[in-house]
Amino acid sequence: MSEAPRIQLLSPRLANQIAAGEVVERPASVAKELLENSLDAGSRRIDVEVEQGGIKLLRVRDDGRGIPADDLPLALARHATSKIRELEDLERVMSLGFRGEALASISSVARLTMTSRTADAGEAWQVETEGRDMQPRVQPAAHPVGTSVEVRDLFFNTPARRKFLRAEKTEFDHLQEVIKRLALARFDVAFHLRHNGKTIFALHEARDELARARRVGAVCGQAFLEQALPIEVERNGLHLWGWVGLPTFSRSQPDLQYFYVNGRMVRDKLVAHAVRQAYRDVLYNGRHPTFVLFFEVDPAVVDVNVHPTKHEVRFRDSRMVHDFLYGTLHRALGEVRPDDQLAPPGATSLTEPRPTGAAAGEFGPQGEMRLAESVLESPAARVGWSGGSSASGGSSGYSAYTRPEAPPSLAEAGGAYKAYFAPLPAGEAPAALPESAQDIPPLGYALAQLKGIYILAENAHGLVLVDMHAAHERITYERLKVAMASEGLRGQPLLVPESIAVSEREADCAEEHSSWFQRLGFELQRLGPESLAIRQIPALLKQAEATQLVRDVIADLLEYGTSDRIQAHLNELLGTMACHGAVRANRRLTLPEMNALLRDMEITERSGQCNHGRPTWTQLGLDELDKLFLRGR
């Protein structure tokens, strides 16, 4: 029998190369670490030069504070940093880097040259090291105030790692994405990128709102900026601001999602869950929302030392953060109206800050959003479009549409589907649109109906096309939600209680949240350490659905501290009712009926999408129509 291998210390070089496996995955990983060091050094301009996707050369140059000559060799040592001293510093760290591992890991798998000069030094100093030679060589050099780090021949001494690198273009795309993320995190810093001698982009400092919006457009594309809703909300020490894309501007991949916590880019499952919930019934199946959001919170309540790449964070009160993010985004999306979507591109974000519905959310003593009030707020409580002179008996000849003062009951809403258009106020569209654009409602006035499916309307911008069924489906759905919220969820006791086996941890969770389940129509009773009984379920649910739903909800509560599955399931049922009850294709409408539907869309939450996330209307501007007919050439 062979002797068991003995335990021994690894050499510093091998230990650093193993550590590099966590920190240095590809050239983009190197760029991230070097750029974060430059930002932590107070740089105002960072130049990045790349050759062969960063595999042959990656040079980062900044104008930061620089590193004293005596500290240069120490900067390449493991666990050497200027950013923290005590454990208490780690609990409130605001710098992007703090572990002191990056340069040591990089220098162990590449040829590294670092040149730096401080403001009070007469000359610059340079240190060189290679993967096989961990003894750095320091010598004088010429360099302005700041630091340059040059990384050549990445993985030259670890062929096994090098062969896993992708093609040059792929590696450069990853590297460019890292720079974009940091450019969005720090608007006050200029970024310049060159690849193989060609300038890719030059982003100047952005210190005012206009310049910040321009940078967002440069990084994310002008189309995103034109289809984004600016938001800013602060509540109970939590501050969220940035841009959220309209549901109609979604992507097939989650590749336009930037979320920052105290200036640090993160990809956190709690954040992702809150965002998914907010977009739940306005996003088409399989599509992903777009956003650039900045979340600021006391650093003492967030732990950034969770993952080697620092992409994950842990919040001390995760439920409060989740509810704040969800409530803010849900309200902001719910406040979007056709006139918001018809505003000139970027006009809202480039002028004065706009008030959003998210700012009106109310939080209880524990910081929880009262979702029943904020999410299911009645559209009937809003003041509809007045239409200027036309609403007050002016020249348009069209009387403004008036919603009922109180929302209908669930039974009334359910039974009134086919009679929806009967009580609508009569009135004809004006023969000609009012001269003033302010007197024209956002969706304009109906002109005709096409194939019994689409409504054609004229507004101040051109032609509006409305999917009649999809629009009515959303209006009916929102009315049903309002009715359910006002009446409450009626519970239905089970003749024979349903017993379900769970773990002790799950049973504890259900018992802890029993009052929460009760508000949603469930009554749960603990029978034993690992057993629950369902005694009552919401009247709209079937018993078989309820059993699995309780299991899923408990799993969510354990994972996120909250769950929207019950509400989502009920909303799905209401959505089905609304879909079946909405006006069908080939239903001929009169002009007054079409105009009444347009007015209703203008005051209904999320009227831009049906319950399944499909758009309900689109705008064809005069410029687009002119292009179709080659006018103006």
UniProtKB/Swiss-Prot annotation:
Highest taxon in the source lineage: Bacteria
GO cellular component: mismatch repair complex
CDD domains linked: HATPase_MutL-MLH-PMS-like (cd16926), MutL_Trans_MutL (cd03482)
A family per Pfam: MutL_C
Keyword DNA damage: yes
Ranges of compositional bias, category Gly residues: 385-396
Region of interest called Disordered, as start-end residue ranges on this chain: 337-364, 383-405
PROSITE patterns registered for this protein in UniProt: DNA_MISMATCH_REPAIR_1 (PS00058)
Keyword vocabulary terms for this entry: DNA damage, DNA repair
InterPro entries: DNA_mismatch_repair_CS, DNA_mismatch_repair_MutL, DNA_mismatch_S5_2-like, HATPase_C_sf, MutL/Mlh/PMS, MutL/Mlh/Pms-like, MutL_C, MutL_C_dimsub
Listed GO biological process terms: mismatch repair
An annotated Gene Ontology molecular function: ATP hydrolysis activity
Function (record text): This protein is involved in the repair of mismatches in DNA. It is required for dam-dependent methyl-directed DNA mismatch repair. May act as a 'molecular matchmaker', a protein that promotes the formation of a stable complex between two or more DNA-binding proteins in an ATP-dependent manner without itself being part of a final effector complex.
NCBIfam families linked: mutl, PRK00095.1-2
Family affiliation: Belongs to the DNA mismatch repair MutL/HexB family.
The protein, known as: DNA mismatch repair protein MutL
